[in-house]
Amino acid sequence: YTDYRKDRPMVAMWSQDWTLPEVPAKQYSDKLISDAKDFSDEAVITITRVGGEGADLPTNMKAKGITYNNNSKDYEDFKDGEHFLQLSQTERDMIDLVTKNFKKVTLVYNGANAFQFDFLSQYPQIKSVLWCPPAGQTGFSALGEVLAGDVNPSGKTSDTFAKDLTKTAVFNNTDGTAAGNASSVGTNGKFTYDNADDLTASYMGFSGDKVTVTPTFVNYVEGIYVGYKFYETAADEGLINYDDTVMFPFGYGLSYTTFKQEMGKVSYKNGKISFDVTVTNTGDKAGKDVVEVYYNPPYTDGGIEKASKNLVAFEKTKKLEPGASQTVKIEFDDDDMASYDQKDAKAYVLEQGDYDISIQSDSHHVIDHQKVTVKDTVTYNSDSNTHNGDAVAATNE
């Protein structure tokens, strides 16, 4: 398998080969599958994606300038309009083969970017998904310990996993191809300047074709509504059906055990909000849990832009044996709940009103909540009264 493709694809800043080397399913022999079933009644599937700051991921794998070599002459891995963060045909065929032969399957996703897991509902045999971002020097040893049950996972998702990435705000706001403004390199995120022709550059791509690029830019029209702040606010406003849109929320993560979190009385004194959370391991395996604290600020239609869910604090427990408890102390400043007013105050503002403070299992599911009331509006617009310890007061440029 390691010799399947010796010239491994590379994604770098100046040139990218997006090929996903994968053995076609028909090359898996009956004996190989039989031997695997004799070894274990559980199977592990690994899906991998590269991607970092060096290059934007393709929103259309068939776009001009995208270098990709299919794994078979019998079919194409991607159809026109399919993107890099969804299954290739070879991967889907492999999953079909594995799930036909195993009733218990774990899928490991090795990649830094949120993958499109909409296919999971089609495979009830896939019992669990493990997100393993770029693992570095020792990460895969840890992965083995988690899979074997020697280590109880306690991580949480650092992004929202959408069911259809093509319908997300960020996908559409950075997709130059969809807007008809794609540069000739054919990747996403590109709106070209119309006065920078003298800065155009050309180079030879992996495919041997000449690739021409020009300076580009992106319109960040989402404002503050990025990631979970968009999904939670959009759901609260009735813009989206959350369950139809989100696969895994921000801050979501499973364990081999179960926990109970109990929220103590919230205190608000001298600009500090504090309370205790008692976490109890209610399962039968030792493990750690994460306390996630969110706030929902008062909002006036047409006023300062605010998200309805905002992560303000989090703490992880020590390793708790079954039945054991730990009380976690939560404390944060009230100016952590301030919002930036770019229209009127042109500064951070902590508006008066009721703020909902909640402990949650992720960005969407509330365990318990209480209210704190800010009596007077505070505007952080002077060097003697800056927001959250800023050296100078933030303001519009």
Which residues are covered by each model-predicted region?
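C-terminal non-catalytic regions of proteins with extracellular/luminal or membrane-system context
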Residues: 1-397
